Amino acid sequence: MAMKSVSTLAVFAILFLVIVEMPEIKAQGSKCLKEYGGNVGFSYCAPRIFPSFCYRNCRKNKGAKGGRCRSGGAGAGSMICLCDYCSDKP
C-alpha cells in the first residue's frame, strides 16, 4: 500500500513539473507581423494588383517573407500594411 502511494505521488509530482515547465503559448502574430509604416492607403493594398505593393515592399525593403493588408480603422482608404516574417502567403 505504501509503495502505491509513493508511486502515485511521484506521478503527480512529475506531471506537475511538466505542466509548470511548458512554455506559454503566445499569439504567433505578435512575432510574425510587424507594421510596415503607418497608414499606407488603399492603393498600396489594392486587390486588383497581385501581389500587392505591401507584399512586394515588405519582401524587398524589410526582408520579410511577405506582407498583408488590414483595415486601419475608421476613415476612407485607411489601410495598414503588416510585414509577415513567418509566411509568404499574400
Swiss-Prot record:
Residues 1-27 form the signal peptide. GO terms for biological process: defense response; defense response to fungus; killing of cells of another organism. It holds the Pfam family Toxin_3. Changing M3T: In strain: cv. Sah-0. Keywords: Antimicrobial, Disulfide bond, Fungicide, Plant defense, Secreted, Signal. One of its GO terms (molecular function) is serine-type endopeptidase inhibitor activity. The record marks R48, I49 as: Reactive bond. Disulfide bonds join C32-C86, C45-C69, C54-C81, C58-C83. Belongs to the DEFL family. Protease inhibitor I18 (RTI/MTI-2) subfamily. This is Defensin-like protein 193. It comes from Arabidopsis thaliana (Mouse-ear cress).
